[in-house]
């Protein structure tokens, strides 16, 4: 007899621990430099949520061997929110950040956030 089980709490616990490690800058293997901001992360985590980072880290490009990656022409606060999303699956979309968050989520190919931004903008439309 065999049984496959899924314990969601374990997955949540694991990501909470990884996020805590990230916040303490422990066991991180990449630093994303966006403007004046340095965002510490784990390549495996950000590659798992972004096809952009997946391609960057799994192909034979210069960035795949670097520990520091400069992201140009991206809003630093949006990148920070998206990295937080990679670890928590939560993101706060506001009238103030949606105009910056949407283009960065498109560049990084983060479809759930892109859709959430579009839904947010659509909900803000006034038919009059």
Question: Where in the sequence are the language-model features?
Answer:
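Cytosolic, low-complexity regulatory segments enriched in Ser/Pro/Gly with interspersed Lys/Arg
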Residues: 1-6
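Canonical BTB/POZ domain core
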Residues: 10-19, 23-128
